Amino acid sequence: MAPWTRDEEWFREARRRLVERLVREGYIRSEHVKRAMLRVPRELFVPDELRHLAYEDTPLPIGHGQTISAPHMVAMMTEYADLKPGMKVLEVGAGSGYHAAVMAEVVAPSDEPREHWGHVYTIERIPELAEFARRNLERAGYADRVTVIVGDGSRGYPEKAPYDRIIVTAAAPDIPGPLIDQLKPGGKMVIPIGDRYLQHLYVVVKTRDGKIESRPVTPCLFVPLVGEYGWREYEADTTLA
C-alpha cells in the first residue's frame, strides 16, 4: 500500500502494535503512559512525506536539523518523569509537539473533567518549529492542554514557574541553573547530559528542603540544547550531532 493511501484505521493498528511492543520490551510500564501513547496519533506530528514511518521505533527528521524522538525514548522519559493528572509540566524543546501531546494525555486525560486537568508548557527556540508544533497540537486536539512558547529553553519559562515536572528533549553540557530554580520542591526533571560522544539521561529530584539529587539512568543520543545555559551555536555544530 502506498504511503499516501494509508487511512486512519491503518495508523490506529500500527500504533497499537508499536505500543504492545514497547510494553513487551519494558519501555512502557504504567497504564497511563500506555493509554496516552495509544491515544496520541504520531502520524499527525511528522512531516507528511514521512507519515508512513510514524510507527517505526526510530527518530525522524522534522527540519531545521531537529528530530522527533523515537517512541521508545518518549515512553521512557515519560515513565521516568512519573507524571500525574493535574500536574504542571515544562518541556524544553517542543520539536513537532508529539512528546508534549503524550504528556498532556497523562496530566490532562481526555476522559477527565477539565477542572482536574494539568497543563504542559513547551518552549522551542526555532520559530518555524514552534509554529509546526502549534499546528500539529491544534489538529490533534491538544491546543487547550499544551501552550507553545518561542524562546531559549535553557532559561526555562519563569512566567509559569514553578513546575511539578521538567522534561528536556535536547542534550545539555550540565543541568541549566534556571531549570533547577523553576522546579518545585519535590519535583522531578528528566534531562540528557553530555557531549557528542557520550550522553546519559538523568533523573533529577529537588527534595522538599531544596537539595538536588541526580542519577544517570541510561545512555542516549539527543540533538544539542542550544541557548544561554546550554551549548552555543558554534559549540553545537562541533560538539553534538
UniProtKB/Swiss-Prot annotation:
Q: Does the keyword Methyltransferase apply?
A: yes
Compartments where found:
Cytoplasm
Predominantly, its location class is cytoplasm
Top-level division of the source organism's lineage: Archaea
Gene Ontology MF terms in the entry: protein-L-isoaspartate (D-aspartate) O-methyltransferase activity
- What lineage is this protein's organism placed in? Archaea, Thermoproteota, Thermoprotei, Desulfurococcales, Pyrodictiaceae
The UniProt entry, under HAMAP family, shows: PIMT
Catalysed conversion reaction: [protein]-L-isoaspartate + S-adenosyl-L-methionine = [protein]-L-isoaspartate alpha-methyl ester + S-adenosyl-L-homocysteine
Any idea of its EC number?
2.1.1.77
Query: Iron as a keyword?
Result: no
Give the family, as the similarity comment puts it: Belongs to the methyltransferase superfamily. L-isoaspartyl/D-aspartyl protein methyltransferase family.
Q: What is this protein called?
A: Protein-L-isoaspartate O-methyltransferase
Which CDD domains is this protein grouped with?
A: AdoMet_MTases (cd02440)
The cellular component terms of Gene Ontology attached to this UniProt record, alphabetical and capped at eight, are: cytoplasm
Please state what class of enzyme this protein is.
transferase
Q: Which UniProt keywords apply?
A: Cytoplasm, Methyltransferase, S-adenosyl-L-methionine, Transferase
For this protein, the record's SUPFAM superfamilies field holds: S-adenosyl-L-methionine-dependent methyltransferases (SSF53335)
- Name the residues annotated as catalytic in the UniProt entry: 69
Which GO BP terms apply?
methylation; protein modification process; protein repair
Q: Its function?
A: Catalyzes the methyl esterification of L-isoaspartyl residues in peptides and proteins that result from spontaneous decomposition of normal L-aspartyl and L-asparaginyl residues. It plays a role in the repair and/or degradation of damaged proteins.
